[in-house]
Amino acid sequence: MWRAIWLRISEKGLRRPPPPSLRTVTTSCTTMGADGVHTVNTTERLAKLRELMKQHSVQAFVVPSEDQHSSEYLANCDKRRAFISGFDGSAGCAIITTDKAYLFTDGRYFLQAEKQLDKNWKLMKQGLPDVPTWQDFLYKNLGPHTQIGIDATLLAASDAESLTKQLTPKYSKLVSLKENLVDVVWGEDRPSRPQNSVFHLDVKYSGQSHLDKIATLREEMKKKKAEAIVVTMLDEVAWLLNLRGSDIEYNPVFFAYAVVTMDEVILFIDSAQLDDTARHNLEHVYTMPYEAIFEHLNSLSRTLELDRDSKVLIGDRASLAVADAIGKDNYTIVRSPIADLKAIKNKTELEGFRQSHIRDGAALVRYFAWLEEQLNHGTVINESQGADKLEAFRSELDLFRGLSFDTISGTGPNGAIIHYKPDPNDCAIIKKDQVYLCDSGGQFLDGTTDVTRTWHFGTPTDEEKRAFTRVLQGHIAIDTAVFPNGTTGYVIDAFARRALWQDGLDYRHGTGHGVGHFLNVHEGPHGIGVRIALNNTPLKAGMTVSNEPGYYADGKFGIRIESIVLVREVKTPNNFGDKGYLGFENVTMCPIHKNLVDVSLLNEQEKKWLDEYHAETWDKVSPLLKGDTRALEWLRRECSPL
């Protein structure tokens, strides 16, 4: 999983620190079996945790994935759920009772969790029939009068409010503990919080000054009659102030809060982290120590002299601790206006996406051409070595600052593990007679990339070709979709699945996620998928989103085709309802493997799309490959017409 090439983000790039060793092996609920080579033995950790629970008079303890900023990706010091359970996927929640331990996660991680959890854990496969969410489990499955221990800095205030309402009729309640019990069990071995350098992102990349962004935010605050907004999400702080850091692996963010009023902006950060570029460009922004945030929030309502009609805004992922510090009657939970502003990229950011993806395409072509040559020569290459080589090619690109996530390099059955991460000490050899799935991305000063391509360097089976072609048809259906303004990703998700459904196939993940601009590779609030929450955010011109349908045959192979698309306005012959219509612009430039295509399944429009996509890829990427005969000839072959 963890590879030897480390990078550091500052003006010099992103560094990957050595991680803790957590690499460890369906019905809707699965009790894990005996410990295996990939399993962390959690017996002692759970025993210590339960003893602490007893001392604090709680009968259950909740260990969410997120940190106190509700981050999806975490610094090593915040990987509490991974420490206590052994499961290190990016999504999930652990609930420990006096005699049982439950791990809740979604379909992306079922196979991974089954491999990593030991016999102490029961896997709860969220999304399958009769499996509750972890929130529902607390009030539906636990008995009455249950004291449920939580860390208020890790639980969203919105979740706490709804849970409290549900638990009250059963005389159960959430108990905010002064210390995180998992941290106590972890003890001195728990890593310290990173405090890496923070730098200014020049306006030639961001396209808008931080002062303009703050002015726009204040206009949104006026609409909501707010005197202040507390910014808790790390990517929102970074975007608002045009700052970038490296406190969390793969994500150019840093630990900080911000409080914006009509008169001032305060950044709560360890000031020693700010380099000269950051200090010189933080005009009209005050700084205070990171740890001072809660004390400041305690006094905020008095300082602002809030009345019945004026409130402090907090986002819907802000923690219960933040809400409690402000005071019960002084805040309003809203969907973060910064999330909506950040989601729509400006012209500079959109052009950065185009250019960074073209450069990224050159690295991908070099890698796949190299890999095919090595396999044809009989060279033994394992999944981790392949990922390392791809990273090496990317590291040569202009404006590269590191990976945007850990490369998923999976051959054969490992490709069916949706978020598989190869362990250099225990991973498979890439074989010519197996399907190979590679999902990877980079962080660049002018954009963030995320691309998946699936290959077969030998002779694929009819089953593999048919499945790949159905996935391709879904990919094309999204790419060519035209829809009226006001349409959500929830509505168009079925376009990606239609061809798979014809064969009785499907996949257990969303079709698309938003992508940050030199920020987190997963960004909301929009996306394409079946989660009902995605029906709350219409797709708008300027948004970026992935297009990644897939199919996974457990124990055999995995297929995914992923490109990044920009939402754009399109001209249509008519304009019913004067709504205006939208479509997509594909910016990912990497061939789609024709060796896996069953051409007989494609209609003429789909064939035309594939040929035109390959012609565009050749035109844009080939100029970057001058002098690399191997890559050029490979690209020429892969981009030739059907």
UniProtKB/Swiss-Prot annotation:
SUPFAM superfamilies: Creatinase/aminopeptidase, Creatinase/prolidase N-terminal domain. Binds 2 manganese ions per subunit. GO terms for biological process: proteolysis. Coiled coil: none annotated. Its EC number is 3.4.11.9. GO terms for cellular component: cytoplasm. It is an enzyme of class 3 (hydrolase). It catalyses: Release of any N-terminal amino acid, including proline, that is linked to proline, even from a dipeptide or tripeptide. One of its GO terms (molecular function) is metalloaminopeptidase activity. Pfam families: Creatinase_N (PF01321), Creatinase_N_2 (PF16189), Peptidase_M24 (PF00557), Peptidase_M24_C (PF16188). Belongs to the peptidase M24B family. Catalyzes the removal of a penultimate prolyl residue from the N-termini of peptides. This is Probable Xaa-Pro aminopeptidase P.
